[in-house]
C-alpha cells in the first residue's frame, strides 16, 4: 500500500457468468500493470496466463466461487497452499452474511485466516450483507465488515453505504483497512464521487472490477482513481479535469 492506500482490481467475475471485458484478461492486465497495486484472479486464470508471472502488480488469489444460479452461496475452490504455489502475494475469500450458507462461509473464512497467519500471507475478506430479506444499509454493512474483522481478515472489502458519514461508521467499526467495492457499472462521475466520499470517510482504497475492465480505457480510469485516492483535497472541491477520458501519460 502506497501511503496506506491501495487500488485493487478484482477480475474474478468470469466464474459467475459471462462478463464483458475479461474475455482476454492478459490484455487488461497489460493495460493496468504498473498502475493498479494488485489484481484478484482465480487459479485457472493464473495457470493459463502468459503475463501474470511477469507483471509488476501484486497477485491476490481468490479462493471463493459461485455461479449466477446460486449467487450468494459461496464455496471454497482453492487453498492457501495453492496460492503460495502460484506465487500469490495474498488470498481473498468472499462471505455473504445472511445467505443460506452463511455458517459454512464463516467457518471457511476463519480456517483460511488461520492458515494465512501460519504462512504469513495476508487475507482480503470480501464481506457483504446478502441473502433473502437482507437489506443493504449502514447497519448490515457494518455487521458484515465486523464479521470479517472478527474472523481475522487483514483487509476488508465491502460495499459503499451512500454517504461519507455512513461509511465512516463502517470504517470505524473495524481495526483493519477497509476498501470500497465498485459495485455495478456506473457513470464515471458517479464512480469518482463515491470513491472520493469513501476516502473522506477513512477508506484505505478501492477494489473495483467492472468499472475498470469494462471501461473503454482501463488504464485511464485507474489513473483517475489513484489521483482521487491519494489526494487530500477537501470534500467541497470539484473533481478537476477529465482524467478518465484522456488519462495522463
What function would you assign to each model-found segment?
Residues 199, 213-243:
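C-terminal helical cap(s) of enzyme catalytic domains, especially alpha/beta-barrels
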Residues 6-54, 58-67, 72-180, 186-208, ...:
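Alpha/beta enzyme core
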Residues 235, 248-249:
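Basic polycationic patches enriched in arginine
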Amino acid at each position: 500500500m502506497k501511503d496506506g492506500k491501495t487500488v485493487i482490481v478484482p477480475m474474478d467475475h468470469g466464474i459467475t457468468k459471462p462478463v464483458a471485458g475479461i474475455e482476454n484478461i492478459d490484455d487488461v492486465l497489460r493495460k493496468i500493470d504498473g498502475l493498479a497495486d494488485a489484481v484478484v484472479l482465480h487459479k485457472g486464470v493464473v495457470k493459463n496466463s502468459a503475463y501474470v508471472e511477469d507483471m509488476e502488480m501484486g497477485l491476490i488469489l481468490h479462493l471463493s466461487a459461485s455461479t449466477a444460479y446460486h449467487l450468494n452461496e459461496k464455496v471454497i475452490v482453492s487453498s492457501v497452499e495453492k496460492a503460495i504455489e502460484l506465487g500469490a502475494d495474498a488470498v481473498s475469500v468472499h462471505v455473504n452474511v445472511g445467505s443460506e450458507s452463511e455458517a459454512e462461509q464463516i467457518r471457511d473464512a476463519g480456517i483460511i485466516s488461520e492458515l494465512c497467519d501460519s504462512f504469513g500471507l495476508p487475507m482480503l475478506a470480501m464481506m457483504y450483507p446478502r441473502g433473502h430479506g437482507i437489506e443493504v444499509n449502514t447497519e448490515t454493512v457494518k455487521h458484515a465488515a465486523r464479521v470479517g474483522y472478527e474472523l481475522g481478515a487483514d483487509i476488508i472489502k465491502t460495499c459503499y453505504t451512500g454517504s461519507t458519514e455512513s461509511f465512516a461508521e463502517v470504517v470505524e467499526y473495524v481495526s483493519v483497512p477497509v476498501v470500497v467495492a465498485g459495485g455495478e457499472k456506473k457513470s464515471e462521475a458517479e464512480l469518482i464521487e463515491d470513491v472520493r466520499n469513501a476516502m473522506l470517510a477513512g477508506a484505505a482504497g478501492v477494489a473495483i472490477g467492472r468499472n475498470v475492465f469494462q471501461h473503454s480505457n482501463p488504464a485511464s480510469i485507474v489513473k483517475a482513481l489513484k489521483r482521487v485516492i491519494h489526494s487530500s483535497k477537501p470534500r467541497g472541491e470539484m473533481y478537476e479535469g477529465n482524467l478518465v477520458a484522456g488519462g495522463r501519460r
